[in-house]
From Swiss-Prot:
The keyword rRNA-binding does not apply. One of its GO terms (molecular function) is thymidylate synthase activity. Keywords: Cytoplasm, Methyltransferase, Nucleotide biosynthesis, Transferase. The gene is thyA. It comes from Latilactobacillus sakei subsp. sakei (strain 23K) (Lactobacillus sakei subsp. sakei). This is Thymidylate synthase. GO terms for cellular component: cytosol. DUMP binds at R23, R178, R179, R218, S219, G220, D221, N229, H259, I260, Y261. The keyword Metal-binding does not apply. It is found in: Cytoplasm. Pathway: Pyrimidine metabolism; dTTP biosynthesis.
Length: 316
C-alpha cells in the first residue's frame, strides 16, 4: 500500500536521523536524500493514519495554478496554510502598532496568555485582508513564490514564461521529451519570498499512455508538510493527465533534507502506531477540460476513511 512508504520514511528518520539545528530554532531529526514511489493506479495517496484536510490541499494547488501569491484567495476558501508567513511580514512592518509579536510562533506554544493575544491579532489581520483590498495587496502578498514562478517566471528581457501552460503543451505534442520540467527555484527572487520554495522542481514522464511525475523537494517537514505535498502533486498529476488524455502512472517524491521537528516526535509516534485504511479514489469533474477551469467543487475524494487528525505546531 502506498501509504506504507511514507510511514517507512517517518520511522527511518526517528531511528537513523541526525539531530540538527534549523532556521526556526526548533531543532530537527534529519536525513538527506530519500525517495518514495506512489503508484497512482492503486488509489489516491491521501494519508489515512491521520485525517487530512483535502479541501486545503486542493484550494492551495488551485491557488498555485492561478499564478496567485496573495493569501486573500486562500482566506476566501477558509484556507489558513500560509497565514503565519504573511502575518510575520506585517508585524515586522512600521504599519503594525499592536502588541509585541516577536517570535510569535514559539511564544504561542509556550505561553497560554500570549497565545490568546496572538490569535486575536491574527484574526484581526485576516479580517482586514478580506475586507480591505489595498491592505491585502500590501500585506497579503508573499512575494514571487510558487504560483508566480509556475505561471509568470520573469525573464531578463522583462517578459514572463508560463511554465505550466508550456509543459502541458509539450506533453501533448512531444511526450517523449526529457524537458517536461517546471521549476519554482529562481535564485534572483529567493530573497524577496516569504518562504523560498521547499518543493523546488518537478518533471513529467510519459510511457505507455501514462503520465508520471517526479518532484524534487529541497526541504520536507515530514509530519506536517510532506503529506500535503504528496497529495498535492498526485492531484496535479491527475489534473494534467486529465487535460492531456493520459492515464496516471507514478508519483515519485525525492527529498533533500527530510526532517521531523523535535516538537513533532510524539505525534509521529502516535501516527506510526495506527492502522492504515484503504486509499480513497479521486473524482474530477469530467465536464472540465482545462486544468485552469477547475474550481474546488470540481475535485473530490471518494470513500475516504481515516484515523483522527493529529495536531502539531507549525515552525515559521
Amino acid at each position: 500500500m502506498s501509504e506504507q512508504v511514507y510511514l517507512d520514511l517517518a520511522r527511518t528518520i526517528l531511528e537513523e536521523g541526525h539531530y540538527k539545528g534549523d532556521r526556526t530554532n526548533t531543532g530537527t531529526y534529519s536525513l538527506f536524500g530519500y525517495q518514495m514511489r506512489f503508484n497512482l493506479q492503486e488509489g489516491f495517496p491521501l494519508l489515512t493514519t491521520k485525517k487530512m484536510p483535502f479541501g486545503l490541499i486542493k484550494s492551495e494547488l488551485l491557488w498555485f495554478l492561478k499564478g496567485d501569491s496573495n493569501i486573500r484567495y486562500l482566506l476566501q476558501h477558509n484556507n489558513h496554510i500560509w497565514d503565519e508567513w504573511a502575518f510575520e511580514r506585517f508585524v515586522k512592518s512600521t504599519d503594525y502598532t499592536g502588541p509585541d509579536m516577536t517570535d510569535f510562533s514559539h511564544r504561542a506554544q509556550d505561553d497560554a496568555d500570549f497565545k490568546v493575544v496572538y490569535q486575536e491579532q491574527m484574526r484581526l489581520f485576516n479580517d482586514r485582508i478580506l475586507a480591505d483590498e489595498g491592505f491585502a495587496k500590501q500585506y497579503g502578498e508573499l512575494g514571487d513564490i510558487y504560483g508566480k514562478q509556475w505561471r509568470a517566471w520573469q525573464t531578463r528581457s522583462g517578459e514572463t514564461i508560463d511554465q505550466i501552460k508550456n509543459v502541458i503543451e509539450m506533453i501533448k505534442t512531444n511526450p517523449d521529451s526529457r524537458r517536461l520540467i517546471v521549476s519554482a527555484w529562481n535564485p534572483e527572487d529567493v530573497p524577496s519570498m516569504a518562504l523560498p520554495p521547499c518543493h523546488t522542481m518537478f518533471q513529467f514522464y510519459v510511457n505507455d499512455g501514462k503520465l508520471s511525475c517526479q518532484l524534487y523537494q529541497r526541504s520536507g517537514d515530514v509530519f506536517l508538510g510532506v503529506p500535503f505535498n504528496i497529495a498535492s502533486y498526485a492531484l496535479l498529476t491527475h489534473l494534467i493527465a486529465h487535460e492531456t488524455g493520459l492515464e496516471v502512472g507514478e508519483f515519485i517524491h525525492t527529498l533533500g533534507d527530510a526532517h521531523i521537528y523535535s516538537n513533532h516526535v510524539t505525534q509521529v509516534k502516535t501516527q506510526l502506531a495506527r492502522s492504515m485504511h484503504a486509499a480513497p479514489k479521486l473524482w474530477l469533474n469530467p465536464d472540465k477540460k482545462s486544468i485552469f477551469d477547475f474550481d474546488v467543487a470540481d475535485i473530490k475524494v471518494e470513500n475516504y476513511e481515516s484515523e483522527p487528525a493529529i495536531k502539531a505546531p507549525v515552525a515559521v
